[in-house]
């Protein structure tokens, strides 16, 4: 019976003030295990004005911040006024219905929901704290937590799996390191004397936080932004029981325009397809770049079965994207002008650039190798003027002093091309020797254009004339020997007859 009477006497509003009052008796009677659990694992209520260390929050931004933030402040003023008018308008009917209720829920109004900030620069946002009535005792019941939550752009399903297989994922300092953990940047309280206190930032001067007591605004700066700062800030207002009342998210979008755009169109042989690669270096975040292709000013569409794109992330430098395309080559028309158009987009910011390349086309040369008069002779037709000849014997390059090359005339079918003839003495060493005539100066594999033949100097390969010669010599020797023997016998017989007579 006592409880209903107390409720009727105090009213629900009075009971609400009683619960919010910093009474040691009431606080001791409530078990923390029965309260609503906090959003994250830390407990901001452990950071109190009686604990150490704490730092007094500056009451105004630095001179540099004021000068660089004049435009931002004006925008914030407009946003705050608009938000305030909307707040009053939207809650007019509620105020009339609750005219006797002097306590309202607190609120936080921030000047933006997204902060786009370029690499190594400073990002800023301002929030207005709405507490009614804004008395010192009322302020003392609230805690403002500033929490950073990362967003990792440095991995996708394919390259993360490859990194796991290679044992690189999660290695500190690698491109696949685990993302930065969510962490409490600051926990702010206000004492009854009107002084704001905050816990030290875990990153030193990385974050600068200030509060204007007159306008009840809080400003936050993230200095020297890097890729690890890509994420969102949570501004959470909690009551003295650590229960979240308001939770605002402000996204920090780290930006970096592409540092360079290049098109690589490697040389091709006449009749082979053209291939080109567009390389967009050092931008952020991945996915903010869009690539399109042009061939002689006309739209060219990559084929899914042979073209595509891929990207990788370099620590401290950003993302790099490579897009490829394959185009037909009739072998008759002039090589095309291949252009890559790149658009980088973040929020309302757009940056475009392009690059162009024209591939070089080479024609197939004609060459043949033969042996004549003790020389290996290489005949070459229709090669550019920068092409030279290199001889190899048993696949070993020979000094250019051992052979000579001359220009025999101009190519009749291709302009600015010429014909060559080169020769080198063969080795008459009674063995089988390999000779190679190779063209040097083409932007392809070194052995792309060459011809090889074997010169066989073994006795069996010298042919029938050699056998006939040897046989003739041996036969002549036998005949001469027999003639000498017969002559000697005749002389011997005639001498014996003369002696008998």
Curated annotation (Swiss-Prot):
Residues 1-27 form the signal peptide. Residues 53-87 are annotated as: Disordered. Residues 493-501 are cytoplasmic. GO terms for cellular component: extracellular region; host cell plasma membrane; membrane. The keyword Transmembrane applies. Residues 28-465 are virion surface. It is found in: Secreted; Host cell membrane. Belongs to the herpesviridae glycoprotein C family. May play an immunoevasive role in the pathogenesis of Marek's disease. It is a candidate for causing the early-stage immunosuppression that occurs after MDHV infection. This is Envelope glycoprotein C homolog. It comes from Gallid herpesvirus 2 (strain bc-1) (GaHV-2). The gene is gC.
């Amino acid at each position: 019976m006592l409880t209903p009477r107390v409720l009727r006497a105090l009213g629900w509003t009075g009971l609400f003030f009683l619960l919010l009052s910093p009474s040691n008796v009431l606080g001791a009677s409530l078990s923390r295990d029965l309260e609503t659990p906090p959003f994250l694992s830390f407990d901001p209520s452990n950071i109190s004005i009686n604990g150490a260390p704490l730092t007094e929050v500056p009451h105004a931004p630095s001179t540099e911040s004021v000068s660089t933030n004049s435009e931002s402040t004006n925008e914030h003023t407009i946003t705050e006024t608009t938000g305030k008018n909307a707040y009053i308008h939207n809650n007019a009917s509620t105020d009339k219905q609750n005219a006797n209720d002097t306590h309202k829920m607190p609120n936080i109004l921030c000047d933006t929901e997204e902060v786009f900030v370029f690499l190594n620069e400073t990002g800023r946002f301002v929030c207005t704290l709405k507490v009614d009535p804004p008395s010192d005792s009322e302020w003392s019941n609230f805690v403002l937590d500033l929490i950073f939550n990362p967003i990792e752009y440095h991995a996708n399903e394919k390259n993360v799996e490859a990194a796991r297989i290679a044992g690189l994922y999660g290695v500190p300092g690698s491109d696949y390191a685990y993302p930065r953990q969510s962490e409490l940047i600051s926990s702010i309280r206000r004492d009854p004397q009107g002084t704001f206190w905050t816990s030290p930032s875990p990153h030193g001067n990385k974050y600068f936080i200030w509060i204007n007591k007159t306008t009840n605004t809080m400003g936050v700066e993230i200095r020297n932004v890097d890729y690890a700062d890509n994420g969102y800030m949570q501004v959470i207002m909690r009551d003295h029981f650590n229960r979240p009342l308001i939770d605002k998210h402000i996204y920090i979008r780290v930006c970096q325009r592409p540092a360079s755009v290049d098109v690589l169109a490697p040389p091709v042989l006449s009749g082979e397809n053209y291939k080109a690669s567009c390389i967009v270096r050092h931008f952020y975040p991945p996915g903010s770049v869009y690539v399109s292709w042009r061939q002689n000013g006309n739209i060219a569409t990559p084929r899914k079965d042979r073209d595509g794109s891929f990207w990788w992330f370099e620590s401290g430098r950003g993302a790099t994207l490579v897009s490829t395309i394959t185009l037909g080559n009739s072998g008759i028309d002039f090589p095309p002008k291949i252009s890559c158009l790149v658009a980088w987009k973040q929020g309302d910011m757009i940056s475009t650039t392009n690059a162009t390349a024209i591939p070089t086309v080479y024609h197939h040369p004609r060459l043949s190798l033969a042996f004549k008069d003790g020389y290996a002779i290489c005949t070459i037709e229709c090669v550019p003027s920068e092409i030279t000849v290199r001889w190899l014997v048993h696949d070993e390059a020979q000094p250019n002093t051992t052979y000579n090359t001359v220009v025999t005339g101009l190519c009749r079918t291709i302009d600015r091309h010429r014909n060559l003839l080169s020769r080198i003495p063969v080795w008459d060493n009674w063995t089988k020797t390999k000779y190679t005539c190779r063209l040097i100066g083409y932007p392809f594999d070194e052995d792309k254009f060459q011809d090889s033949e074997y010169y066989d100097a073994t006795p069996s390969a010298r042919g029938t004339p050699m056998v006939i010669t040897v046989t003739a010599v041996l036969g002549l020797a036998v005949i001469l020997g027999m003639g000498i023997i017969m002559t000697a016998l005749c002389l011997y017989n005639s001498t014996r007859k003369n002696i008998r007579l």
